[in-house]
């Protein structure tokens, strides 16, 4: 069994990459995809979590006695202090769920890949559970335009969220810059076969550039199959 963590900057294409990776690897492995953001949505429904959040941020974050994510976000991201308060309540609960999923699947590990899709992979210390990490980045102005186009955010909101997530991590890196399939195949092969634990993908290009990355990744990942 291998655990691959996917992290990245807001608007860089992290979740799109993670879902495409899931499809790419599913022909070779039994793939379990963990969307940590979605786990957070589930945790928000827990009565103990609701009580902790309302004590911290006030009852005006509720709508019909449930957490209103938009109202909570407005308060939680208005200052770094509030963001840390939110994280201190949410993260331990979310991490525990991820740990339980990995523990359960480790009982039958043959030909199994677990993908952890988490914007705060490092800050939540989920990276300690990962064998490999792929980090998706893009230039700030490109990310702002994407967030405004795909999520309908204002420019102010997009820029506010740009800097609320993990910074680019340090470690062994293989930079995947673009569309050269053979070059990318060699990079992915090095990532899967050798002791590199971090791959950084710069997603500054077009949708076609982005999609071109997965065919060489598929062929390179064949080598991973014989190691798990």
What are these regions (language model features)?
Residues 15:
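Walker A/P-loop
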Residues 99-150:
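ATP-dependent NMP and nucleoside kinases share a basic, alpha-helical "lid"
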């Amino acid at each position: 069994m291998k655990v691959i963590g996917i992290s990245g900057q807001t608007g860089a294409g992290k979740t799109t990459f993670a879902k495409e990776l899931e499809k790419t690897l599913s022909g070779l492995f039994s793939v379990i995809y963990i969307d940590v953001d979605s786990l957070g949505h589930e945790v928000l429904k827990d009565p103990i979590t609701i009580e902790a959040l309302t004590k911290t941020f006030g009852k005006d974050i509720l709508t019909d006695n449930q957490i209103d994510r938009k109202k909570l976000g407005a308060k939680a991201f208005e200052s770094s202090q509030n963001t840390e308060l939110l994280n201190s309540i949410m993260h331990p609960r979310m991490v525990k769920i991820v740990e339980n999923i990995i523990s359960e699947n480790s009982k039958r590990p043959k030909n199994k890949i677990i993908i952890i899709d988490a914007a705060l992979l490092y800050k939540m210390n989920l990276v300690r559970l990962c064998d490999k990490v792929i980090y998706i980045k893009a230039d700030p102005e490109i990310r702002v335009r994407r967030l405004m186009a795909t999520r309908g955010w204002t420019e102010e909101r997009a820029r506010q969220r740009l800097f609320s997530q993990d910074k680019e991590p340090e470690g062994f890196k293989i930079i995947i810059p673009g569309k050269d399939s053979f070059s990318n195949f060699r990079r992915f092969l090095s990532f899967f076969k050798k002791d590199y634990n971090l791959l950084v993908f710069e997603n500054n290009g077009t949708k076609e550039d982005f999609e071109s990355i997965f065919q060489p990744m598929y062929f390179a990942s064949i080598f991973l199959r014989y190691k798990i």
